[in-house]
Amino acid sequence: MTMDRTSPIFTVRWLAVHGLAVPTVFFLGSISAMQFIQR
């Protein structure tokens, strides 16, 4: 199958998306938590 060809590209894309999404979610979560604690 063509899984061997698309697998590396999908893996790199998956790592890039999660590499950017995880810090973004953590950043937004920390900001919302700070504002919630201040109130």
Curated annotation (Swiss-Prot):
The keyword NAD does not apply. It is a single-pass membrane protein. Keywords: Electron transport, Heme, Iron, Membrane, Metal-binding, Photosynthesis, Photosystem II, Plastid, Transmembrane, Transmembrane helix, Transport. One of its GO terms (molecular function) is iron ion binding. The keyword Electron transport applies. It is found in: Plastid membrane. Its main location: plastid. Heme binds at H18. PROSITE patterns: CYTOCHROME_B559 (PS00537). One of its GO terms (cellular component) is plastid membrane. Its cofactor is heme b. With its partner (PsbE) binds heme. PSII binds additional chlorophylls, carotenoids and specific lipids. The chain crosses the membrane at residues 14-30. Heterodimer of an alpha subunit and a beta subunit. PSII is composed of 1 copy each of membrane proteins PsbA, PsbB, PsbC, PsbD, PsbE, PsbF, PsbH, PsbI, PsbJ, PsbK, PsbL, PsbM, PsbT, PsbX, PsbY, PsbZ, Psb30/Ycf12, at least 3 peripheral proteins of the oxygen-evolving complex and a large number of cofactors. It forms dimeric complexes. This b-type cytochrome is tightly associated with the reaction center of photosystem II (PSII). PSII is a light-driven water:plastoquinone oxidoreductase that uses light energy to abstract electrons from H(2)O, generating O(2) and a proton gradient subsequently used for ATP formation. It consists of a core antenna complex that captures photons, and an electron transfer chain that converts photonic excitation into a charge separation. Belongs to the PsbE/PsbF family. This is Cytochrome b559 subunit beta. It comes from Cuscuta europaea.
